[in-house]
């Protein structure tokens, strides 16, 4: 969600892109919409049910944006996210995958966990380490693109192997 800090809960540009490409180019859901789904949407059994849930998520996401700061929303999202292996939330995931706390994660570890948020099963570092490493590197490239890290850091960290301290 590259525009997380600039949208109001629903990113219509991303939503329009997802509709045009039938969801193949990436989802149109913002972090806030995903949080709304995690907290309030029951599991949909089919595409029609899922389509009917979307407008409700938009309303909830807009309300969340009015009630909470962006940082609070991001924290709620990361504390609700299921990183697999009974690791719900960033604190638990940091322990399960790296035997550390979130504040002590290395950049490559944090990028891997963020990468899992796109699809935890697909980018499961235990079962699919190469996929997880590639996704981590995509996150690092995005961090460089948006100015969070420089090119040298991106290149050096991307070259590192995926190193888990899985418990």
Language-model segment annotations:
Residues 150-167:
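Non-catalytic structural connector segments
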């Amino acid at each position: 969600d590259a525009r997380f800090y600039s949208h109001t809960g629903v990113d219509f540009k991303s939503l329009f892109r997802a509709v045009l490409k039938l969801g193949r180019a990436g989802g149109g859901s913002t972090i806030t919409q995903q949080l709304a789904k995690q907290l309030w949407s029951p599991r949909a059994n089919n595409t029609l049910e899922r389509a009917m849930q979307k407008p409700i998520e938009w309303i909830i996401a807009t309300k969340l944006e009015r009630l909470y700061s962006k940082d609070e929303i991001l924290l709620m999202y990361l504390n609700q996210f299921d990183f697999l292996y009974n690791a719900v939330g960033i604190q638990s995931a940091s322990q399960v995958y790296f035997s550390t706390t979130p504040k002590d994660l290395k950049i490559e570890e944090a990028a891997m966990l963020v990468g899992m948020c796109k699809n935890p099963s697909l980018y499961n570092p235990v079962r699919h380490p190469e996929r997880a490493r590639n996704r981590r590197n995509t996150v690092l490239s995005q961090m460089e693109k948006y100015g969070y890290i420089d090119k040298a850091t991106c290149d050096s960290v991307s070259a590192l192997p995926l190193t888990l301290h899985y418990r």
